[in-house]
Design a protein with these regions (language model features):
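Hydrophobic core of alpha-helical transmembrane segments in multi-pass integral membrane proteins
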Residues: 39-47
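Interfacial segments of alpha-helical transmembrane regions
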Residues: 46-66
Length: 180
């Protein structure tokens, strides 16, 4: 794979300088603001630097665009008041949706070994939204579900065996597919 040299400074800033600057501050809300973007940024960086070709990057883009579009439409349609009394864009949590899209992408594409830490950080982002009184648990859970479903719909494992639930014509089971 040929490295894309022009991306190194941007990714260094996205992955290290920007999060560390914000995480150094006291505000739990600011931590969630930063980490919601850091997780998908790491996922995109993995597709650009680890993989050959652009299949992973395209899958990442589809998952992210689907998540953000779904969140935008629901926020404009539902008009739910936030727990802090601000009107009217609480449902679903966009921060949780973005973070969980990145975490589910990492897990789905590269496996649970990378996915578990990503999900833990995404769960912390959801916690920051509840703790800062921007969302309730339902808002965060809905955002997380949107992000996870978007990634699961578009993302395929990078290498190895894929296990997919199967249900059709009264038959149920697991389907195993692989890339060699």
């Amino acid at each position: 794979m040929t490295p894309r040299i022009w991306l190194y400074p941007l990714l260094a800033w996205l992955l290290f300088a920007w999060p560390l600057k914000t995480l150094a501050k006291d505000s739990i809300e600011q931590q969630g603001d930063t980490l919601q973007y850091a997780i998908p940024a790491v996922a995109l960086a993995a597709t650009l630097f680890y993989e050959d070709g652009y299949d992973g990057s395209i899958q990442w883009l589809k998952a992210v665009v689907t998540t953000e579009t779904t969140v935008y439409v629901l926020k404009k349609s539902v008009h739910k008041e936030r727990p802090n009394g601000n009107c009217c864009s609480a449902f679903p949590s966009g921060h949780a949706a973005t973070a969980f899209t990145g975490a589910a992408f990492i897990q789905r594409r590269y496996g649970w070994g990378y996915g578990v830490p990503a999900y833990l950080v995404a769960a912390y982002v959801g916690y920051t939204r509840i703790e800062s009184d921007k969302h309730d648990t339902t808002d965060v859970a809905a955002g997380a579900l949107i992000g996870i479903l978007s990634s699961y719909y578009f993302v395929e494992p990078y290498k190895g065996i894929k296990i997919t639930p199967y249900a059709a014509n009264g038959s149920y089971g697991l389907m195993f597919t692989g890339r060699w």
